[in-house]
Regions:
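Conserved SAM-binding strand-loop segment of SAM-dependent methyltransferases
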Residues: 2-16
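Conserved Rossmann-like nucleotide-binding pocket used by diverse enzymes
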Residues: 9, 27, 56
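A short acidic, Gly/Pro-enriched loop at the edge of an enzyme's catalytic core
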Residues: 14-26
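A short SAM/SAH-binding and catalytic strip from SAM-dependent methyltransferases
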Residues: 24-38, 61
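A short glycine-rich, Lys/Arg-flanked "PGG" loop and its adjoining helix->strand segment in the class I
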Residues: 39-54
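C-terminal alpha-helical "lid/dimerization" subdomain adjacent to the S-adenosyl-L-methionine
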Residues: 58-113, 117, 123
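Core SAM-dependent methyltransferase catalytic element
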Residues: 111, 115-141
Length: 141
Protein backbone atom coordinates (compact mmCIF):
# COMPACT_ATOMS: atom_id res chain seq x y z
CA UNK A 1 0.00 0.00 0.00
CA UNK A 2 1.37 3.39 -0.98
CA UNK A 3 0.74 6.21 1.45
CA UNK A 4 1.39 9.68 0.04
CA UNK A 5 3.85 11.76 2.03
CA UNK A 6 2.37 14.79 3.75
CA UNK A 7 5.63 16.49 4.59
CA UNK A 8 9.19 15.55 3.83
CA UNK A 9 11.98 17.06 5.92
CA UNK A 10 15.67 16.93 5.05
CA UNK A 11 18.17 17.76 7.74
CA UNK A 12 21.03 16.87 10.05
CA UNK A 13 20.40 13.51 11.73
CA UNK A 14 22.49 14.60 14.73
CA UNK A 15 20.41 17.74 15.32
CA UNK A 16 16.93 17.31 13.88
CA UNK A 17 15.28 20.71 13.61
CA UNK A 18 11.80 19.54 14.62
CA UNK A 19 9.83 19.56 17.87
CA UNK A 20 9.62 16.41 19.98
CA UNK A 21 6.92 13.83 19.14
CA UNK A 22 6.36 15.40 15.72
CA UNK A 23 6.75 12.73 13.01
CA UNK A 24 5.29 9.31 12.25
CA UNK A 25 8.16 7.84 10.24
CA UNK A 26 11.84 8.52 9.69
CA UNK A 27 13.58 6.86 6.77
CA UNK A 28 17.22 6.93 5.85
CA UNK A 29 19.10 5.25 3.04
CA UNK A 30 22.81 4.47 2.97
CA UNK A 31 23.63 7.13 5.57
CA UNK A 32 24.11 5.40 8.94
CA UNK A 33 27.66 4.41 7.98
CA UNK A 34 28.53 8.07 7.51
CA UNK A 35 27.21 9.44 10.80
CA UNK A 36 29.83 10.48 13.34
CA UNK A 37 27.69 9.72 16.42
CA UNK A 38 25.18 6.86 16.12
CA UNK A 39 23.88 7.08 19.72
CA UNK A 40 23.11 10.79 19.27
CA UNK A 41 21.43 10.14 15.91
CA UNK A 42 19.18 7.48 17.44
CA UNK A 43 18.38 9.76 20.41
CA UNK A 44 17.33 12.50 18.01
CA UNK A 45 15.25 10.15 15.88
CA UNK A 46 13.44 8.72 18.90
CA UNK A 47 12.88 12.23 20.28
CA UNK A 48 11.04 13.53 17.21
CA UNK A 49 8.96 10.38 16.63
CA UNK A 50 5.33 10.36 17.74
CA UNK A 51 4.11 7.49 19.95
CA UNK A 52 4.29 4.26 17.92
CA UNK A 53 6.53 6.07 15.42
CA UNK A 54 9.00 4.08 13.40
CA UNK A 55 12.47 4.58 11.96
CA UNK A 56 13.69 2.59 8.96
CA UNK A 57 17.37 2.79 8.03
CA UNK A 58 18.67 0.91 4.99
CA UNK A 59 22.41 0.50 4.75
CA UNK A 60 25.13 -1.70 3.33
CA UNK A 61 26.42 -4.29 5.79
CA UNK A 62 28.74 -7.29 5.97
CA UNK A 63 27.25 -10.75 5.41
CA UNK A 64 27.53 -13.14 8.36
CA UNK A 65 27.92 -16.27 6.22
CA UNK A 66 31.68 -16.92 5.90
CA UNK A 67 31.55 -17.69 2.17
CA UNK A 68 29.45 -14.61 1.38
CA UNK A 69 31.65 -12.54 3.69
CA UNK A 70 34.84 -13.43 1.79
CA UNK A 71 33.22 -12.95 -1.62
CA UNK A 72 31.79 -9.62 -0.51
CA UNK A 73 35.17 -8.52 0.85
CA UNK A 74 37.00 -9.37 -2.38
CA UNK A 75 34.30 -7.70 -4.48
CA UNK A 76 34.50 -4.48 -2.46
CA UNK A 77 38.29 -4.38 -2.26
CA UNK A 78 39.03 -5.12 -5.91
CA UNK A 79 36.11 -4.90 -8.31
CA UNK A 80 34.28 -1.84 -6.93
CA UNK A 81 37.34 0.48 -6.81
CA UNK A 82 38.46 -0.73 -10.26
CA UNK A 83 35.05 -0.02 -11.81
CA UNK A 84 34.94 3.32 -10.01
CA UNK A 85 38.29 4.24 -11.51
CA UNK A 86 37.32 3.10 -15.02
CA UNK A 87 33.96 4.88 -15.13
CA UNK A 88 34.44 7.83 -12.77
CA UNK A 89 38.21 8.24 -12.75
CA UNK A 90 38.11 8.12 -8.96
CA UNK A 91 39.66 5.10 -7.25
CA UNK A 92 39.72 6.71 -3.80
CA UNK A 93 35.99 7.46 -3.53
CA UNK A 94 35.08 3.86 -4.27
CA UNK A 95 37.72 2.58 -1.86
CA UNK A 96 35.96 4.68 0.78
CA UNK A 97 32.79 2.65 0.21
CA UNK A 98 34.60 -0.59 1.06
CA UNK A 99 36.24 0.94 4.12
CA UNK A 100 33.00 2.42 5.45
CA UNK A 101 31.24 -0.95 5.18
CA UNK A 102 34.14 -2.76 6.83
CA UNK A 103 34.25 -0.29 9.73
CA UNK A 104 30.46 -0.15 10.22
CA UNK A 105 29.32 -1.87 13.44
CA UNK A 106 27.63 -5.26 13.19
CA UNK A 107 23.84 -5.44 12.97
CA UNK A 108 23.61 -6.64 16.58
CA UNK A 109 25.57 -3.61 17.79
CA UNK A 110 23.35 -1.27 15.76
CA UNK A 111 20.20 -2.85 17.24
CA UNK A 112 21.57 -2.61 20.78
CA UNK A 113 22.56 1.03 20.18
CA UNK A 114 19.03 1.80 18.99
CA UNK A 115 17.50 0.22 22.09
CA UNK A 116 19.96 1.99 24.40
CA UNK A 117 19.12 5.35 22.83
CA UNK A 118 15.37 5.73 22.85
CA UNK A 119 13.84 2.89 20.85
CA UNK A 120 11.56 0.47 22.67
CA UNK A 121 12.18 -2.22 20.09
CA UNK A 122 14.59 -2.70 17.22
CA UNK A 123 14.86 -5.40 14.60
CA UNK A 124 16.67 -6.04 11.35
CA UNK A 125 15.53 -7.15 7.93
CA UNK A 126 18.46 -8.82 6.17
CA UNK A 127 18.60 -8.39 2.39
CA UNK A 128 20.68 -10.20 -0.22
CA UNK A 129 22.36 -12.51 2.26
CA UNK A 130 23.43 -9.65 4.52
CA UNK A 131 24.92 -7.32 1.92
CA UNK A 132 22.28 -4.81 2.96
CA UNK A 133 20.13 -4.54 6.08
CA UNK A 134 17.09 -2.49 7.05
CA UNK A 135 17.15 -1.47 10.71
CA UNK A 136 13.65 -0.87 12.06
CA UNK A 137 13.11 0.89 15.37
CA UNK A 138 9.81 1.63 17.11
CA UNK A 139 9.13 4.18 19.84
CA UNK A 140 6.14 3.48 22.10
CA UNK A 141 6.28 6.54 24.45
Amino acid sequence: KVIPAKNIHHGDALKIDLPSSNVDVISMGFALRNLSDLPLAFQEMSRVLKPNGRTLCLDLTRPENIILKWGHYLFLRTYVPMVGFIFAGNFKAYSYLANSIREFPTADIILRTMEENGFDSARKVVLWGGIATIFVGTVKK
